[in-house]
Protein backbone atom coordinates (compact mmCIF):
# COMPACT_ATOMS: atom_id res chain seq x y z
CA UNK A 1 0.00 0.00 0.00
CA UNK A 2 1.40 3.39 -0.99
CA UNK A 3 2.00 6.22 1.46
CA UNK A 4 -0.73 8.16 -0.32
CA UNK A 5 -3.24 5.38 0.27
CA UNK A 6 -2.31 5.14 3.96
CA UNK A 7 -2.61 8.89 4.37
CA UNK A 8 -6.03 8.91 2.76
CA UNK A 9 -7.19 6.07 4.98
CA UNK A 10 -6.12 8.02 8.05
CA UNK A 11 -8.54 10.78 7.07
CA UNK A 12 -11.52 9.02 5.50
CA UNK A 13 -13.38 6.44 7.58
CA UNK A 14 -14.34 3.15 5.89
CA UNK A 15 -18.08 3.32 6.55
CA UNK A 16 -19.41 6.35 4.68
CA UNK A 17 -22.25 7.00 2.28
CA UNK A 18 -19.93 7.04 -0.71
CA UNK A 19 -16.46 6.26 0.57
CA UNK A 20 -13.96 8.54 -1.06
CA UNK A 21 -10.34 7.47 -1.56
CA UNK A 22 -8.05 8.79 -4.27
CA UNK A 23 -5.14 6.64 -5.42
CA UNK A 24 -3.74 7.38 -8.86
CA UNK A 25 -0.97 5.55 -10.72
CA UNK A 26 2.50 6.43 -9.49
CA UNK A 27 3.53 7.90 -12.82
CA UNK A 28 0.89 10.61 -12.45
CA UNK A 29 3.09 12.49 -9.98
CA UNK A 30 1.55 15.91 -10.52
CA UNK A 31 -1.91 14.65 -9.63
CA UNK A 32 -0.59 12.86 -6.54
CA UNK A 33 0.97 16.12 -5.40
CA UNK A 34 -2.41 17.82 -5.75
CA UNK A 35 -4.04 15.05 -3.72
CA UNK A 36 -1.40 15.39 -1.00
CA UNK A 37 -2.06 19.14 -0.83
CA UNK A 38 -5.81 18.54 -0.60
CA UNK A 39 -5.32 16.04 2.22
CA UNK A 40 -3.02 18.33 4.17
CA UNK A 41 -5.58 21.12 3.89
CA UNK A 42 -8.36 18.83 5.14
CA UNK A 43 -6.21 17.60 8.03
CA UNK A 44 -6.22 21.14 9.39
CA UNK A 45 -9.96 20.84 9.89
CA UNK A 46 -10.45 17.14 10.68
CA UNK A 47 -9.34 14.66 13.31
CA UNK A 48 -7.97 11.37 11.98
CA UNK A 49 -10.86 9.43 13.48
CA UNK A 50 -13.57 11.73 12.17
CA UNK A 51 -16.08 10.25 9.72
CA UNK A 52 -16.26 11.98 6.35
CA UNK A 53 -19.85 11.49 5.19
CA UNK A 54 -20.25 12.10 1.49
CA UNK A 55 -23.98 12.69 1.42
CA UNK A 56 -26.24 14.81 -0.73
CA UNK A 57 -25.39 18.53 -0.87
CA UNK A 58 -21.94 17.95 0.70
CA UNK A 59 -18.79 19.10 -1.08
CA UNK A 60 -16.65 16.06 -1.83
CA UNK A 61 -13.38 15.49 -3.73
CA UNK A 62 -13.65 14.59 -7.41
CA UNK A 63 -11.18 14.35 -10.27
CA UNK A 64 -11.66 16.89 -13.06
CA UNK A 65 -9.72 17.89 -16.16
CA UNK A 66 -8.71 21.03 -18.01
CA UNK A 67 -5.96 22.09 -20.42
CA UNK A 68 -3.46 21.62 -17.59
CA UNK A 69 -4.42 17.98 -17.07
CA UNK A 70 -6.15 16.10 -14.26
CA UNK A 71 -6.62 17.74 -10.88
CA UNK A 72 -8.48 17.25 -7.60
CA UNK A 73 -11.24 19.66 -6.66
CA UNK A 74 -14.36 19.71 -4.51
CA UNK A 75 -17.88 19.86 -5.89
CA UNK A 76 -21.30 19.67 -4.28
CA UNK A 77 -23.08 16.37 -4.78
CA UNK A 78 -26.51 17.18 -6.20
CA UNK A 79 -27.51 19.48 -9.06
CA UNK A 80 -30.29 22.02 -8.54
CA UNK A 81 -30.92 23.90 -11.77
CA UNK A 82 -33.23 26.53 -10.28
CA UNK A 83 -33.02 27.12 -6.49
CA UNK A 84 -35.71 29.81 -6.70
CA UNK A 85 -38.25 27.41 -8.17
CA UNK A 86 -36.81 24.63 -6.00
CA UNK A 87 -36.41 22.20 -8.87
CA UNK A 88 -35.72 18.59 -7.81
CA UNK A 89 -32.20 17.81 -6.64
CA UNK A 90 -30.50 15.57 -9.18
CA UNK A 91 -27.84 13.34 -7.63
CA UNK A 92 -27.89 10.49 -10.18
CA UNK A 93 -27.90 10.75 -13.99
CA UNK A 94 -29.17 7.70 -15.87
CA UNK A 95 -27.00 6.30 -18.65
CA UNK A 96 -29.97 5.98 -21.01
CA UNK A 97 -30.97 9.61 -20.41
CA UNK A 98 -27.42 10.76 -21.17
CA UNK A 99 -27.42 8.73 -24.37
CA UNK A 100 -30.77 10.03 -25.64
CA UNK A 101 -31.11 13.65 -24.52
CA UNK A 102 -28.81 16.28 -26.09
CA UNK A 103 -28.67 18.45 -22.94
CA UNK A 104 -27.36 15.63 -20.74
CA UNK A 105 -25.15 14.25 -23.49
CA UNK A 106 -23.47 17.64 -23.83
CA UNK A 107 -22.92 17.92 -20.06
CA UNK A 108 -21.36 14.46 -20.01
CA UNK A 109 -19.15 15.37 -22.95
CA UNK A 110 -17.98 18.81 -21.79
CA UNK A 111 -18.23 18.55 -17.99
CA UNK A 112 -17.14 15.01 -17.20
CA UNK A 113 -15.56 14.09 -13.85
CA UNK A 114 -14.53 10.95 -11.97
CA UNK A 115 -15.60 10.14 -8.43
CA UNK A 116 -13.13 7.83 -6.59
CA UNK A 117 -14.83 5.35 -4.24
CA UNK A 118 -14.12 2.33 -2.12
CA UNK A 119 -17.78 1.33 -1.88
CA UNK A 120 -21.38 2.44 -1.75
CA UNK A 121 -24.69 1.65 -0.08
CA UNK A 122 -27.97 0.48 -1.59
CA UNK A 123 -31.36 -0.07 0.03
CA UNK A 124 -32.87 -3.52 -0.62
CA UNK A 125 -36.65 -3.82 -0.56
CA UNK A 126 -37.54 -6.67 1.82
CA UNK A 127 -41.31 -6.23 1.74
CA UNK A 128 -43.90 -4.76 4.10
CA UNK A 129 -42.60 -1.28 3.23
CA UNK A 130 -39.25 -2.15 4.80
CA UNK A 131 -35.80 -1.72 3.32
CA UNK A 132 -32.44 -3.15 4.33
CA UNK A 133 -29.26 -1.08 4.05
CA UNK A 134 -26.55 -3.00 2.18
CA UNK A 135 -22.88 -2.04 2.09
CA UNK A 136 -21.25 -2.95 -1.24
CA UNK A 137 -17.53 -3.15 -2.05
CA UNK A 138 -15.70 -4.77 -4.95
CA UNK A 139 -14.07 -8.13 -4.31
CA UNK A 140 -10.84 -7.45 -6.22
CA UNK A 141 -10.56 -3.66 -6.12
CA UNK A 142 -10.11 -1.55 -3.03
CA UNK A 143 -10.64 1.63 -5.03
CA UNK A 144 -12.71 2.22 -8.16
CA UNK A 145 -13.91 5.14 -10.25
CA UNK A 146 -17.42 6.25 -11.16
CA UNK A 147 -18.13 8.69 -14.03
CA UNK A 148 -20.00 11.86 -13.24
CA UNK A 149 -20.97 15.19 -14.76
CA UNK A 150 -21.27 18.68 -13.36
CA UNK A 151 -23.27 21.85 -13.81
CA UNK A 152 -22.05 25.34 -12.94
CA UNK A 153 -24.77 27.27 -11.08
CA UNK A 154 -25.48 31.01 -11.24
CA UNK A 155 -22.97 31.64 -8.48
CA UNK A 156 -20.27 29.90 -10.50
CA UNK A 157 -20.13 26.91 -8.16
CA UNK A 158 -20.01 23.40 -9.57
CA UNK A 159 -22.59 20.77 -8.62
CA UNK A 160 -22.38 17.17 -9.82
CA UNK A 161 -24.32 13.97 -10.26
CA UNK A 162 -22.91 10.49 -10.69
CA UNK A 163 -23.87 8.24 -13.60
CA UNK A 164 -25.98 5.13 -12.95
CA UNK A 165 -26.87 2.13 -15.07
CA UNK A 166 -28.76 -1.16 -14.87
CA UNK A 167 -27.63 -3.51 -12.09
CA UNK A 168 -24.98 -6.13 -12.74
CA UNK A 169 -25.75 -9.82 -12.30
CA UNK A 170 -24.24 -9.51 -8.83
CA UNK A 171 -26.47 -6.62 -7.78
CA UNK A 172 -29.76 -7.40 -9.49
CA UNK A 173 -31.24 -9.00 -6.36
CA UNK A 174 -30.39 -5.91 -4.30
CA UNK A 175 -31.38 -2.91 -6.39
CA UNK A 176 -32.59 -1.96 -9.87
CA UNK A 177 -29.80 0.58 -10.47
CA UNK A 178 -26.10 0.89 -9.68
CA UNK A 179 -23.29 3.40 -10.22
CA UNK A 180 -21.36 2.95 -13.45
CA UNK A 181 -17.96 1.52 -12.51
CA UNK A 182 -15.04 1.75 -14.93
CA UNK A 183 -13.73 -1.81 -14.83
CA UNK A 184 -10.31 -1.51 -16.46
CA UNK A 185 -7.37 0.86 -16.01
CA UNK A 186 -7.44 2.11 -19.59
CA UNK A 187 -11.05 3.21 -19.22
CA UNK A 188 -10.03 5.32 -16.23
CA UNK A 189 -6.76 6.71 -17.61
CA UNK A 190 -8.30 7.64 -20.97
CA UNK A 191 -11.64 8.87 -19.63
CA UNK A 192 -10.88 12.57 -20.02
CA UNK A 193 -9.33 12.29 -23.48
CA UNK A 194 -11.59 9.66 -25.07
CA UNK A 195 -14.36 10.80 -27.41
CA UNK A 196 -17.97 11.16 -26.32
CA UNK A 197 -18.89 7.99 -28.20
CA UNK A 198 -16.09 6.02 -26.54
CA UNK A 199 -17.17 7.17 -23.09
CA UNK A 200 -20.85 6.49 -23.76
CA UNK A 201 -19.85 2.90 -24.56
CA UNK A 202 -18.38 2.61 -21.05
CA UNK A 203 -21.74 3.31 -19.39
CA UNK A 204 -22.71 -0.28 -18.65
CA UNK A 205 -23.02 -2.61 -15.65
CA UNK A 206 -19.74 -3.60 -14.04
CA UNK A 207 -18.59 -7.21 -14.29
CA UNK A 208 -16.69 -6.99 -11.01
CA UNK A 209 -17.71 -9.37 -8.24
CA UNK A 210 -18.94 -7.72 -5.07
CA UNK A 211 -18.90 -8.30 -1.32
CA UNK A 212 -22.02 -7.27 0.57
CA UNK A 213 -22.70 -6.60 4.22
CA UNK A 214 -26.03 -5.92 5.90
CA UNK A 215 -25.88 -2.75 7.95
CA UNK A 216 -27.73 -2.03 11.14
CA UNK A 217 -30.39 0.66 10.82
What are these regions (language model features)?
Residues 1-217:
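Short linear sequence motif anchored by a di-proline
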Amino acid sequence: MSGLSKLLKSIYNEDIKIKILDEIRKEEENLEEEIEKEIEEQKKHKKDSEVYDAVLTHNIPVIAYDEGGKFITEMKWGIMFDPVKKTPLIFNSRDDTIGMKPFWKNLFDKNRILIPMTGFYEWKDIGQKKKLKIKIVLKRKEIFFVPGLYWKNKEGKREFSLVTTSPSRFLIEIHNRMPVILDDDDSVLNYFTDSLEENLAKLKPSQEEIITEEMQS
